[in-house]
């Protein structure tokens, strides 16, 4: 029985030895990911030596309690090694952020616990690969952050340069505006100055165009320039131009008026004297005879001829070149005939008949004469009445009396008695009797 117990004791440490080896490997792998790269070969050699020692201990039939104490010692040694490696890593990567340090220390402890729970060699290899990947990703992030910081510095420097250029351009604009204000006071003096100013403005606009394109690169759009003063300057220039044009037009009109006066004087001289003689006198004096002067001389000759024939002269307010003097004289004659008073002469027979017409009633006679516009001449009418006219007047009186009687009868039938039928009644017979 004693021999069998010893054999079991010998077998037990042999069975437990592979478990120990796995735990040792896991504990060695639980070192921080940055240290695992550099100390991978050393950990392997140590694990092999520990395997050999554990085999020797199994052969010597050590007890389980002994093996437990050995495990505790080994775990203490490993923990001290871990602390050293972590301190070393902290010194190497002191430039990293505080968040990464905390994450690395916490990840180390979590990994140590997980590895003690799990017992598989393949998983440890995958974890080491993941650590390497994380390490690479962190290095990439550092590079990216450095490049970003450089870009930010560059963008800041660019923005400063743009601000400086803007301030310079604003100062230039202010200078230009101040110059333009001082110039605008003396714009109305000369036209040449306004032309030179407009040319200089065009040049400035051409110079400022490429600057606007360079400003468009900035993120914030620049505000539009204030153009109120420019419009005012343009309005002043337009007023000055209008004034100049008005002055020119006035000068031209004055010249035309002077020429017309000269022509009228020449025409008057031609009218008073012979036109041929005046033209000859002008030629003799040496003055140039223009076609206008010749036309004025001809018109003056026509006016003199019309005056001699009709005795009517064309007034001076008419244009002698546009008015025919003979036609003007005929029109004046007609006007005089129309508007002159009537001469006292013999009246026609028809006028006398209408004047002496008698309706048998004085009121009717007065009304008729007023309507016809005949003046009352009773005394003259009574004295100058002939026998023939007297007969005609009597006949007219009878006719008018008969008409009045018939009118009264018709009125009584239609309005008062209201006769029936077509009118062939006793009333009509009574009319015939009357």
From Swiss-Prot:
Source organism superkingdom: Eukaryota
Cross-link Glycyl lysine isopeptide (Lys-Gly) (interchain with G-Cter in SUMO2) per UniProt, renumbered positions: 375
Renumbered residue ranges of the record's region Disordered: 1-230
UniProt KW keywords: Acetylation, Coiled coil, Isopeptide bond, Phosphoprotein, Ubl conjugation
Keyword Acetylation listed: yes
One GO molecular-function entry: RNA binding
Skewed-composition ranges (Basic and acidic residues): 1-27, 66-111
Annotated crosslink Glycyl lysine isopeptide (Lys-Gly) (interchain with G-Cter in SUMO1) location: 375
Biased composition (Basic residues): 35-51, 112-214
Modified residues annotated as Phosphothreonine in this record: 6, 16
Chain positions with N-acetylalanine modification: 2
Residue list for modification Phosphoserine: 4, 17, 30, 32, 104, 376
Coiled-coil positions: 230-270
Signal peptide: none
Record family assignment: Belongs to the RSRC2 family.
Name the record gives this protein: Arginine/serine-rich coiled-coil protein 2
Native species: Homo sapiens
Encoding gene, per UniProt annotation: RSRC2
């Amino acid at each position: 029985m004693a021999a069998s117990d010893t054999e079991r004791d010998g077998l037990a440490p042999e069975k437990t030895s592979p478990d120990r080896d796995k735990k040792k490997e896991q504990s060695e792998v639980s070192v921080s990911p940055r240290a695992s790269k550099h100390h991978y070969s050393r950990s392997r050699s140590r694990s092999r030596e520990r395997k050999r020692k554990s085999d020797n201990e199994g052969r010597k039939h050590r007890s389980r309690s002994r093996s437990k104490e050995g495990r505790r010692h080994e775990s203490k040694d490993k923990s001290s090694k871990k602390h050293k490696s972590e301190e070393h890593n902290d010194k190497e990567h002191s430039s990293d952020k505080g968040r990464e340090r905390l994450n690395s220390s916490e990840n180390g402890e979590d990994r140590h616990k997980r590895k003690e729970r799990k017992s598989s060699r393949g998983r440890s290899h995958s974890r080491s690969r993941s650590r390497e990947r994380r390490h690479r990703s962190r290095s990439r992030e550092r590079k990216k952050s450095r490049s970003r910081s450089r870009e930010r510095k560059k963008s800041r420097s660019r923005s400063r340069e743009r601000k400086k250029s803007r301030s310079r351009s604003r100062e230039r604009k202010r200078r230009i505006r101040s110059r333009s204000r001082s110039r605008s006071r003396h714009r109305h003096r000369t036209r040449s100055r306004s032309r030179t100013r407009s040319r200089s403005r065009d040049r400035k606009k051409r110079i400022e165009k490429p600057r606007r394109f360079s400003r468009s690169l900035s993120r914030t759009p620049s505000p539009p320039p204030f153009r109120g003063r420019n419009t005012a300057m343009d309005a002043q220039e337009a007023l000055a131009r209008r004034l100049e044009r008005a002055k020119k037009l006035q000068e031209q009109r004055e010249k035309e008026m002077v020429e017309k006066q000269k022509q009228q004087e020449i025409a008057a001289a031609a009218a008073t004297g012979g036109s041929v003689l005046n033209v000859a006198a002008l030629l003799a004096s040496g003055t140039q005879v223009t076609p206008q002067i010749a036309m004025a001389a001809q018109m003056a000759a026509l006016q003199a001829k019309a005056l001699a024939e009709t005795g009517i002269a064309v007034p001076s307010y008419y244009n002698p070149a546009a008015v025919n003097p003979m036609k003007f004289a005929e029109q004046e004659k007609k006007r005089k005939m129309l508007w002159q008073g009537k001469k006292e002469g013999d009246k026609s027979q028809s006028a006398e008949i209408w004047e002496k017409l008698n309706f048998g009633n004085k009121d009717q006679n007065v009304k008729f004469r007023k309507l016809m516009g005949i003046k009352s001449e009773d005394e003259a009418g009574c004295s100058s009445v002939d026998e023939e006219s007297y007969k005609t007047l009597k006949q007219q009186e009878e006719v008018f009396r008969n008409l009045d009687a018939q009118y009264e009868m018709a009125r009584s039938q239609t309005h008062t008695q209201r006769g029936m039928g077509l009118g062939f009644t006793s009333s009509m017979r009574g009319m015939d009797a009357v």
